[in-house]
């Protein structure tokens, strides 16, 4: 599946004009298909993502909801999907609170197979300078990606 469909018009400029705020690169000793499957798994709670479940069809134009303990924590919209290679979605912290007021941000996963290793690049853009989401993201992604790597390479997850 490689597609882009109707995107919320308010999000389209965000999608096309963002400069990256954070770029994380991690190499995972697993096939690209296994890494992709973990990223788009909508059936299981993700122990590697601090017990977060993602509810989504992962189809462009569709919604994505991150749930912790059965409660929506983050919502977004899938903007692009190219199976096994790329996924782009918006990321908006649920309100009320100061993080909610910071507006939507943009997350992009890019996967490349290199021999028996997958190079996963995560780019997070449109974060408010000095904002609380930016602060949380700066420490959150390294932990989440380390958890994904641990889970895929040895079956163990990290706990916070």
What are the roles of these predicted feature ranges?
Residues 1-23:
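Short acidic N-proximal helix/loop "leader" segments that mark the beginning
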Residues 2-8, 126-160:
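A conserved amphipathic terminal alpha-helix motif
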Residues 23-24, 43-77:
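Short beta-edge strand/loop motif at the mouth of beta-sheet-based domains
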Residues 84-92:
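Short, solvent-exposed secondary-structure boundary/capping segments
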Residues 92-96, 123-130:
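Short, solvent-exposed aromatic-acidic interface loops
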């Amino acid at each position: 599946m490689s597609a882009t469909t109707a995107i919320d018009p308010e999000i389209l400029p965000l999608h096309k004009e963002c400069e990256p705020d954070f770029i994380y690169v991690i190499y995972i000793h697993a096939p690209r298909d296994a890494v992709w499957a973990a990223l788009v798994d909508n059936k299981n709670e993700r122990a590697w993502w601090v017990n977060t479940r993602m509810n989504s069809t992962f189809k462009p134009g569709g919604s994505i909801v991150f749930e912790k303990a059965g409660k929506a924590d983050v919502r977004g919209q899938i903007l692009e999907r190219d199976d096994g290679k790329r996924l782009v979605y918006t990321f908006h912290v649920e309100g009320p609170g100061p993080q909610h007021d910071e507006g939507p941000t943009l997350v992009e996963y890019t996967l490349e197979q290199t021999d028996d290793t997958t190079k996963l690049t995560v780019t997070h853009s449109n974060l408010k300078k000095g904002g609380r989401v930016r602060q949380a993201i700066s420490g959150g992604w390294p932990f989440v990606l380390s958890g994904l790597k641990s889970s895929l390479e040895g079956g163990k997850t990290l706990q916070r």
